[in-house]
């Protein structure tokens, strides 16, 4: 059974080769472009960051999805929060998020980023990065595998493709 992304690409290439042109809506083109050109900025805080690096390496190759890691928040539109967020690090996370260009998305990776994880009852741990920044996709696990991260990124791509209009707020789409 083929993946939906590949089915869409196959339909697109068939329509282009048969007719020579393509009819679509501007919203669909913008959604396609945004979903297939995500530029993530890593916010690796703990062991989940190692799995994120593995997903970007040659075996899983996130580049094939159009994702290119950027070192600056001003150049990125996706923040991957990977690991335990402490109270001391929370203001830095918010500052980096505020510096990102619109539209922007956040992926929370791992039990610690999702809800505090193993350190949930520690006095110094934020019980989920969604208390600091709005989160679009949660990837569970301790640590989640590279496959789980790739799956979470594909879910984010689906979410982005479903949006309409030039102004985007992922938290209002269902």
From Swiss-Prot:
Pfam families, sorted: Oxidored_q6
- Annotated cofactor note: Binds 1 [4Fe-4S] cluster.
Gene symbol here is nuoB
Q: Name one GO cellular component term.
A: respiratory chain complex I
Q: Which GO terms describe its molecular function?
A: 4 iron, 4 sulfur cluster binding; iron ion binding; NADH dehydrogenase (ubiquinone) activity; NADH:ubiquinone reductase (non-electrogenic) activity; quinone binding
Provide the cofactor list for this protein: [4Fe-4S] cluster
Class of the enzyme per the UniProt entry, highest EC level: translocase
The record lists the catalysed reaction(s) as: a quinone + NADH + 5 H(+)(in) = a quinol + NAD(+) + 4 H(+)(out)
Q: What is its EC number?
A: 7.1.1.-
Which InterPro entries does the record match to this protein?
NADH_UbQ_OxRdtase-like_20kDa (IPR006137), NADH_UQ_OxRdtase_20Kd_su (IPR006138)
Q: Does the keyword Iron apply?
A: yes
Q: Which UniProt keywords apply?
A: 4Fe-4S, Cell inner membrane, Cell membrane, Iron, Iron-sulfur, Membrane, Metal-binding, NAD, Quinone, Translocase, Transport, Ubiquinone
| Organism expressing this protein natively | Rickettsia rickettsii (strain Sheila Smith)
Family (UniProt): Belongs to the complex I 20 kDa subunit family.
Write the signal peptide boundaries. none
For this entry, the protein name equals NADH-quinone oxidoreductase subunit B
Subunit relationships: NDH-1 is composed of 14 different subunits. Subunits NuoB, C, D, E, F, and G constitute the peripheral sector of the complex.
Enumerate the residues binding [4Fe-4S] cluster: 47-48, 112, 142
Q: Which GO terms describe its biological process?
A: aerobic respiration; electron transport coupled proton transport
User: Which HAMAP family does this entry report, sorted A to Z?
Assistant: NDH1_NuoB
List localization entries: Cell inner membrane
Report membrane topology: Peripheral membrane protein
Which Gene3D superfamilies does its entry note?
Answer: 3.40.50.12280
The protein's job, in short, is: NDH-1 shuttles electrons from NADH, via FMN and iron-sulfur (Fe-S) centers, to quinones in the respiratory chain. Couples the redox reaction to proton translocation (for every two electrons transferred, four hydrogen ions are translocated across the cytoplasmic membrane), and thus conserves the redox energy in a proton gradient.
Q: Which domain of life is it from?
A: Bacteria
